[in-house]
């Protein structure tokens, strides 16, 4: 590492099994179109900027679409880091730790979930259908929401808890 390879020199050996070993060699008249960055040995310290750098690289002989995709990948990474830095700054000014999803941890305890838009909720969109076909469902659902599972008998509470666990495990966006 840190020196140039000569033509025909064995660069690296890879053990495939106990009986065979592949040797990686630099072939004659091999032109390296790209200059690959190689980290210097450990006695040279890293720059501090390298610890905070995300590098998206491609080669000049890649198709245009692949080069364009790497540009958009870099833009996406930079926007994510900018968003994360803004969250850290806001949390620092409010003297609170950010939660996993980016919202303060106390919002769930207050029953406030900013990721849920209350204005376009479809939870009661089927009330007319249930009133027409299943007349007993809407009052039972209202009673169930009001009682908050306290008045359910044990087996129904176990089923509801099991359904909630299944929903939590299957839904990755919660």
From Swiss-Prot:
Main location group: cytoplasm
Family: Belongs to the ATPase alpha/beta chains family.
EC number(s) given by UniProt: 7.1.2.2
Biological processes, Gene Ontology terms: ATP metabolic process
A Pfam family this chain is assigned to: ATP-synt_ab
Source organism superkingdom: Eukaryota
Class of this enzyme: translocase
Topological category with respect to the lipid bilayer: Peripheral membrane protein
Any one GO molecular function term: ATP binding
InterPro entries, sorted: ATPase_a/bsu_AS, ATPase_F1/V1/A1_a/bsu_nucl-bd, P-loop_NTPase, V-ATPase_asu
Designated gene of the protein: ATP6V1A
Protein name: V-type proton ATPase catalytic subunit A
Activity-regulation annotation: ATP hydrolysis occurs at the interface between the nucleotide-binding domains of subunits A and B. ATP hydrolysis triggers a conformational change in the subunits D and F, which induces a shift of subunit d. The c-ring is subsequently rotated and results in a continuous proton translocation across the membrane.
Cellular compartments annotated: Cytoplasm; Cytoplasm, Cytosol; Cytoplasmic vesicle, Secretory vesicle; Cytoplasmic vesicle, Clathrin-coated vesicle membrane
Function statement: Catalytic subunit of the V1 complex of vacuolar(H+)-ATPase (V-ATPase), a multisubunit enzyme composed of a peripheral complex (V1) that hydrolyzes ATP and a membrane integral complex (V0) that translocates protons. V-ATPase is responsible for acidifying and maintaining the pH of intracellular compartments and in some cell types, is targeted to the plasma membrane, where it is responsible for acidifying the extracellular environment.
Keywords of the record: ATP-binding, Cytoplasm, Cytoplasmic vesicle, Hydrogen ion transport, Ion transport, Lysosome, Membrane, Nucleotide-binding, Translocase, Transport
Quaternary structure and interacting proteins, as annotated: V-ATPase is a heteromultimeric enzyme made up of two complexes: the ATP-hydrolytic V1 complex and the proton translocation V0 complex. The V1 complex consists of three catalytic AB heterodimers that form a heterohexamer, three peripheral stalks each consisting of EG heterodimers, one central rotor including subunits D and F, and the regulatory subunits C and H. The proton translocation complex V0 consists of the proton transport subunit a, a ring of proteolipid subunits c9c'', rotary subunit d, subunits e and f, and the accessory subunits ATP6AP1/Ac45 and ATP6AP2/PRR.
UniProt keyword annotation of Calcium present: no
Protein transport found in the keyword field: no
Cellular component terms per the entry's GO annotation: clathrin-coated vesicle membrane; cytoplasm; cytosol; lysosomal membrane; transport vesicle; vacuolar proton-transporting V-type ATPase, V1 domain
Annotated catalysed reactions: ATP + H2O + 4 H(+)(in) = ADP + phosphate + 5 H(+)(out)
């Amino acid at each position: 590492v840190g020196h140039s390879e000569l033509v025909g020199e064995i660069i690296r050996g890879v053990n495939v099994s106990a009986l065979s070993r592949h040797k990686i060699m630099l072939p004659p008249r091999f032109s390296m179109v790209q200059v690959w960055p190689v980290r210097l040995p450990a006695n040279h310290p890293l720059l501090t900027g390298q610890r905070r750098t995300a590098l998206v690289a491609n080669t000049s002989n890649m198709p245009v679409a692949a080069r364009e995709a790497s540009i958009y990948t870099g833009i996406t990474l930079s926007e994510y880091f900018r968003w994360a830095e803004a969250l850290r700054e806001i949390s620092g000014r409010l003297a609170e730790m950010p939660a996993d999803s980016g919202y303060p941890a106390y919002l769930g305890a207050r029953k406030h979930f900013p990721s849920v838009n209350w204005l376009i909720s479809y939870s009661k969109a089927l009330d007319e259908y249930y009133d027409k076909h299943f007349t007993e469902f809407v009052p039972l659902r209202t009673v169930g929401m009001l009682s908050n599972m306290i008045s359910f008998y044990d087996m129904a509470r176990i089923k509801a808890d099991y359904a909630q666990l299944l929903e939590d495990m299957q839904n990755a966006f919660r």
